[in-house]
Regions:
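Charged, gly/pro-rich active-site loop segments
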Residues: 2-20, 88-156
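Short beta-strand segments
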Residues: 37-70
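Compact nucleic-acid interaction/catalytic patches
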Residues: 59-81, 85-88
């Protein structure tokens, strides 16, 4: 039996980055910021693994609406669970690549297919697809949990 103490686990030295701090956003402010950008990422489960797709969106009465391509993985997932929906996360951000300042928001909730003809037509006019392919459907994400943070310059 070896009674020597186990060696301490060490890693790279701690790094302190001056000049920036993170501030948590309220859910209302996070949703407001989400409404100021057009592009985000939807995260859903595919074959028990996370799948991420860039999509454009709009914010409508607190819901996130995206268009979905016919025959896409996400469209098939929602078609398999009509009315029930699937749990998704939606992330959008605006972070300056040089200054590393900005914000990021994640909304988690259930996504359901929009089926009312009037709504589908309305969103078809408001939210234009930006990739090739047939896009006739739309999805509504009702956020249950909204989190976000802002990257700011440090207080001096």
């Amino acid at each position: 039996m070896n009674s020597d103490p186990a060696p301490a686990i060490t890693g790279p030295p701690a790094v302190r980055v001056p000049g920036r701090r993170m501030e948590e956003l309220s859910p209302d402010e996070a949703l407001r910021l989400l409404g100021t950008v057009e592009l985000g990422r939807i995260v859903f489960t595919r074959h028990a693994l996370p799948a991420v797709r860039p999509v454009n969106h709009l914010l409508d009465a607190g819901d996130i609406v995206i268009r979905v391509q016919d025959g896409s993985t996400l469209a098939a997932l929602l078609a398999a669970l009509p009315g029930t929906g699937v749990v998704v996360a939606y992330e959008a951000d605006a972070i300056d690549q040089g200054a590393h300042l900005g914000w990021s928001v994640v909304a988690t909730g259930y996504a359901t297919a929009i089926t009312a003809p009037g709504e589908i037509e309305r969103y078809a006019h408001l939210l234009q697809p930006w990739v090739e392919g047939t896009t006739s459907g739309a999805i509504r994400i009702r956020p249950d949990l909204v989190t976000g943070f802002r990257l700011l310059e440090s207080r001096r």
